[in-house]
Each structure stands twice: as C-alpha cells, then as structure tokens.
Amino acid sequence: MAAQRRSLLQSEQQPSWTDDLPLCHLSGVGSASNRSYSADGKGTESHPPEDSWLKFRSENNCFLYGVFNGYDGNRVTNFVAQRLSAELLLGQLNAEHAEADVRRVLLQAFDVVERSFLESIDDALAEKASLQSQLPEGVPQHQLPPQYQKILERLKTLEREISGGAMAVVAVLLNNKLYVANVGTNRALLCKSTVDGLQVTQLNVDHTTENEDELFRLSQLGLDAGKIKQVGIICGQESTRRIGDYKVKYGYTDIDLLSAAKSKPIIAEPEIHGAQPLDGVTGFLVLMSEGLYKALEAAHGPGQANQEIAAMIDTEFAKQTSLDAVAQAVVDRVKRIHSDTFASGGERARFCPRHEDMTLLVRNFGYPLGEMSQPTPSPAPAAGGRVYPVSVPYSSAQSTSKTSVTLSLVMPSQGQMVNGAHSASTLDEATPTLTNQSPTLTLQSTNTHTQSSSSSSDGGLFRSRPAHSLPPGEDGRVEPYVDFAEFYRLWSVDHGEQSVVTAP
C-alpha cells in the first residue's frame, strides 16, 4: 500500500487513477463555468474552468468529499484533488481511528499535498531562473531584440505551468462523524431537519482579510494587519490561506504588503472542524466553491447566501429525483439570478458584470428526495403535438403534507404549434426572505415533510381532496376531483373557440 501511494505521488502520468475508486452515490454535484457579460447581456467564458471536486467511498467505509476553487489555471486544483485522494483513501483512515488520529491524518495530508506541488514545479522554476539570467538586465521585454523571442515564449509557457493556486474544503465521514478541513474561501454547511424547520450551520470559517483571527495571525508575523484589512487583496486574492501559489510562498519578501513577515504569511495549513456526530441527523451536507455564494451575494447583497442556498437545495429535494439534479438545479438557479440581475439594470446590476466558476456538492443524510416528482416520466409529445396539463391533488394517509402532481395529456396539433409549459409559480417565489445573519439559522423549510402545504401557491388549479371517501350524490356519482378546466381552456384557445369549455 505504501509503495502504491509513493508511486502515485511520484507520477504525473496517472491523471485518472481515481476513476477506479468507488463513487459515493449518496451525493450529487452541480457546476457552471465562469461568465463575463457584455453590454447586450451576452455571457462569455473568461477563462477555462478552474474548479474541481471529488466524492469517494473507500473500501473501509470512509467517505471523502471535496470542492476545490482554483485561480490562474486549473493545474493546482487537479493536482490537489488527485493527491488528497491518495493521501486519505489508501488506508490512512480506518474505523479504529480516534478523533485525534483523523485530525492528524488530515493535517498531514494537506502538508504532503502542498509540499508535493511545490516540489513538482522545482524543475520549471530552475529553468525559468536559467532563462531569465540569459536576458539583458534592465531592458523591458517588449524592447528585446528578435533573438530573444524564443526565450520569452518559453518563459511564458513555464509561467503558465507553475502559476496558480487553489482553495479547498474537504469533508471526511468516518464512524458516523463528520470532519471538515478548510483552506481558503470555500464553504461547508450542515443543514439539519428540525421540528422548527431547517437548521443551517456553516462548519468552517472563511480565511480572508476580513477574518480577525487571520489578521491576528498575520500581525504576529510582524505584518500590518490594519493595512492588510484595508487593502483587502493579497496578490489578487482575498484568501489568506492557499495551496500552491509559489509567488507568495517563495517571493513574499518582494511583495510590499508581506515583505516584513518573519515567515511565510500565506499558508496551506487547514483549519479542521469536528468531529460532528451525525447520529439521528436528517438533512444534508453542502460543500460549495466561493464562486457560487459570491454570485448570489452580488445579486442579492451580502449576509444571507448560506440560508438562501440551503433553502434552494431544500426546494429542489422535493422536485428532483437524483442528487446530481438537485445540485445542478441550484447552480443553474443562482446563475440565472445573477444573469437576470445584471440584465435588469437595477441597483445590484453593477455588482454582477461577471461571476467565477460555481461548484456545489450535496451529501444526503436521509432527507426525502423527489416527493413532488412524477413517479414515471411523462410521454414525449408526438411531432407537432402540444402538452395540456391536467391537475390531480394527491393525499397520503401516511403524510400530513400535500403534494400536487401534474399529469400531461398530449393532443395532436392541427398546424404548427410550439410546445407550451405552464407553471403556477416561479422558482424564486419558493425562497423565503431571511433576516437572521447568524452562522446557525433555522429556516421554515419550503420542502416540509410534516406540516407544510406545498401546493398552496397553485391557487385555483387544485380542488381540495378530503382524506376520507366521498359519499355518492343523488345521481349515484362521486364529485370529481380531477380538474380539466385548464386543459379545456388551452384547447379552446389553440383551436379558435370563442368561449372556454367548462369541465363536465
């Protein structure tokens, strides 16, 4: 096992070795690439995607999840995802380990990954130094004679290979206890279902220039914490902890803001939170990259992104039939909110000219999935046909919640028609307005599994169906509870009827 791990750490030629690791099917991932908007609202990708993620289950029933947010390229994020898996899933963790052992293994894993990456670029750094020594001193690059162009091109290639860094949030689930290790600005949330709603807790802290503990750490190294907080950015990033980024690791003495430091000010040492016991917990774990919550904060303002995203996930749990679909639906929704805010030209539009890559990982702990989804896919409409909705309320004696199921009838067209979709409410209407800004907050769940009425916003589409059997009327018939009114209305409109036919 040790030889296998050394082989993995020494080789850059096995980028897909983790394909052989079993995936965790109790989790799902959604993602979206970065976007910059032009004046006409069109979005284009500013750079290749730089996020990465992992969700594995080892043979000894240890679960590993991670979301990695890169910058200046994706080499570091890919490296970290590969090497952390090697450091944590090749026998280093097992059920006999105590909490202190797990924390020690996590600290050691991050240390090995950081050192391994910096060692992996040693040759490139040496070549860069050698090439730079061949250039005439004091001459700007754009003024160099043509014979130096090949050297300049090689230097640019080397710079791309060695530049960049990554932030990481990692979760380990072992012996039904949750551990979170964090470097940088990605976030981990634990969302628990309670009698009062959904309790949302951020498990880690953001390592930024706004973090008072981080500012104190930097001040102990001899740096001006007040100036760092005022500037807010260190070499292009708000984070005070990063993996990689050789410029701030090796060259911090040449950076005005960091030059007075007694030792490396930007570190890759993780803060570890846990163990968090999960016995009896119903809910879900959230790992998300900085790009996701920053995009939502840009559109809605700071302070409530955690709660809003948790509420969105809760809503999608009721609608989707897979965890990947849950995560992707939330990412798509945040992306749409951000885009719509920019296009609106409103007060928040100036904060939304672009967003970074967005990644969301959701791990389920027994939270009900797909209660509002149709049990089987609707049949595809025939060519040229149109879908007409028929609404049927659903009631279960085993649940006090009420869920609406919308069936679809496909009718042949008498000409060219565009398939229509009709919804009684928008996704955004399901998100509650929140005012509490504490790290732990209880939301009134939109996906209530005990007391809510999720069909209440559907208005007149649904007739109330009592739980008990209805007695027959004088004509021996039971009052219908299937409402065809919307079906007949749309049929009449499409076929040129002057009056809407009422349901029988």
UniProtKB/Swiss-Prot annotation:
The modification Phosphoserine is found at S7, S378, S423, S438. One of its GO terms (biological process) is heart morphogenesis. Changing F216A: Loss of interaction with XIAP. Disulfide bonds: none annotated. The record marks F484 as: Required for interaction with MAP3K7. InterPro entries: PP2C (IPR015655), PPM-type-like_dom_sf (IPR036457), PPM-type_phosphatase-like_dom (IPR001932). Keywords: Cytoplasm, Endoplasmic reticulum, Glycoprotein, Membrane, Phosphoprotein, Ubl conjugation. GO terms for molecular function: mitogen-activated protein kinase p38 binding; molecular adaptor activity; protein serine/threonine kinase activator activity; protein serine/threonine phosphatase activity; protein-containing complex binding. PROSITE patterns: PPM_2. It is a peripheral membrane protein. Residues 28-365 form the PPM-type phosphatase domain. It holds the Pfam family PP2C. Residues 440-457 have a biased composition (Low complexity). Key adapter protein that plays an essential role in JNK and NF-kappa-B activation and proinflammatory cytokines production in response to stimulation with TLRs and cytokines. Mechanistically, associates with the catalytic domain of MAP3K7/TAK1 to trigger MAP3K7/TAK1 autophosphorylation leading to its full activation. Similarly, associates with MAPK14 and triggers its autophosphorylation and subsequent activation. In turn, MAPK14 phosphorylates TAB1 and inhibits MAP3K7/TAK1 activation in a feedback control mechanism. This is TGF-beta-activated kinase 1 and MAP3K7-binding protein 1. It comes from Homo sapiens.
